[in-house]
Regions:
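Macrodomain-like recognition of ADP-ribose-binding/processing modules
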Residues: 1-175
Length: 175
């Protein structure tokens, strides 16, 4: 079951929080920095794994927080190879496939998922959300995925989805 929400993902009661990361071991901005500051042990494990080449695009790098309360896991989700790069939709698609496997293998019943790749990664939220919905909607109803929508500024406006934008021929931009 997918539930969209807003707010501070670190205050989520979900069993696992997804953390968008790169594969070079830097958690310098955004949610990754907040995770680094809140869970220094998770950061150290992730950084060392990056040095060993164990954090790869398309594969979740799961770290136990060691907490008896939530979150039990931080699921590091590589959305870009280097922190200087933009995210690629292909990376999100591959990663979501692996996230489904991780959720099932670890019997995770609730996940807090940010707008992966849409902040510093600069992907379009409407497109990414459609991919999230497509990839995660087949999870059992006993699994709850809290999808945290991005903040778009004071107006809080979202652009129409890609499907809506291009549903009529006269709206297509062929440049």
């Amino acid at each position: 079951m997918i539930i969209t929400t807003k707010g501070d993902i670190l205050k989520s009661n979900a069993q696992a929080i997804v953390n968008p990361v790169n594969t070079v071991g830097v958690m310098g901005k955004g949610l990754a920095l907040q995770i680094r500051e809140s869970f220094p042990n998770v950061y150290n494990i992730y950084r060392n794994a990056c040095k060993l080449g164990k954090v790869q695009i398309g594969k979740m790098f799961v770290v136990s927080t060691g907490l008896t309360s939530h979150p039990e896991y931080i699921i590091n989700f590589p959305t870009k190879k280097h922190w200087k790069e933009k995210s690629k939709l292909w990376y999100i698609q591959q990663g979501l496939d692996d996230l489904v496997e991780v959720i099932q293998q670890r019997n995770i019943h609730s996940v807090a998922l940010p707008a992966i790749g849409c902040g510093l990664g600069r992907l379009d939220w409407n497109v990414v959300y459609e991919v999230i919905d497509m990839k995660l909607s087949n999870l059992p109803d006993s699994v709850v995925v809290f999808v945290y929508e991005p903040y778009f500024g004071r107006e809080g406006k979202k652009r129409p989805s890609i499907l809506q934008q291009y549903s009529q021929p006269h709206k297509m931009n062929w440049r």
